[in-house]
Amino acid sequence: PRLSVRGTGAAVVVKDIVIGGFDNGKLASYALADGSPGWDVLLDPPAGRNEIERLSDINATVRTIGDDLYVVGYRGQLSAVAAESGQALWSQDARSYEGLAVDLQNVYVSGAGSELTALSRVSGAEVWKNEVLKNRDISGPTAWQNSVVVGDFEGYVHFFDSATGELQARVRAGGDRVTSPPLALNDM
């Protein structure tokens, strides 16, 4: 495309394939051994009357649990995809600039309006949604122990219960905005 969103997500390796999202809305696989192309699937098709409306980038890093991939596109598609075949397992509307996190039960996404949403990893059904940080420009989420952790534009780090979505704690990490998903190191 002639116009794309600034940034790019990291590729992931699942078994013997490399998988990445691209600025044309496609998710594609390549053989790790020789780079030969495998499957590709259009997850976030461009639509609209002008270049801005047709932005369809997949800039968030693809997340994996076992053989399942989870990816969110700029225009608003959150999808679960089978790594070996590229077959869509489920898809939901979820516009995000910041990405997502995954644990054994749920997929967590920081929405474009700073809402935090949990979807069932298996079915894609909404488990909970919390809008207490609306318009606080939250970072991408991190799944940590029994919490989902995000930062915000004032330097606060917020901890939510991963099962219920209730706010558990808030700490000031500094005066600067938190722009990246919080990093979990071991049990800290």
Stretch-by-stretch model annotation:
Residues F22-D23, G73-Y74, G111-A112, D152-F153:
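Structural signature of WD-repeat beta-propellers
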Residues D67, G73-Y74, V81:
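Oxyanion-binding "anion nests"
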